[in-house]
Regions:
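Single-stranded RNA-binding regions, centering on S1/OB-family and related RNA-binding modules
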Residues: 1-101
Length: 101
């Protein structure tokens, strides 16, 4: 099992800071120099269309759920902030759905 896979298990709730916008999503600093979080544009909303203009501001904090990762030289943890994915993670933690992240 790789370091990324063992530390950032799918379904884990993590926090980070938005550090860059791209046409395909945002990169998130998750507190580890050699690993970057990535929220792809398709992992923001359950329904409707997300556009880069709607991204959270650079420097803002985000709570997200690990949905995958790369095991190559990119060292990326794929994240989601979709309400349905966050809800499932909060239920696993037995936190009320109204908990702000």
């Amino acid at each position: 099992m790789t370091k990324i896979k063992s530390k950032y298990q799918v379904g884990k709730l993590i926090y980070g800071v938005v550090e860059a916008h791209t046409p395909f999503g945002v990169f998130v600093d998750i507190g580890e120099a050699e690993v970057k979080g990535l929220i792809q544009i398709t992992d923001f909303l359950d329904t409707g269309s997300m556009t880069p203009e709607m991204y959270p501001e650079i420097g803002s904090s985000v709570g997200s759920v690990v949905v995958g990762y790369t095991e190559d030289e990119r060292n990326q943890v794929w994240l989601s902030v979709k309400p349905s994915v966050l809800q499932k993670s909060l239920v696993k933690l037995k936190l009320p759905a109204s908990t702000q992240i």
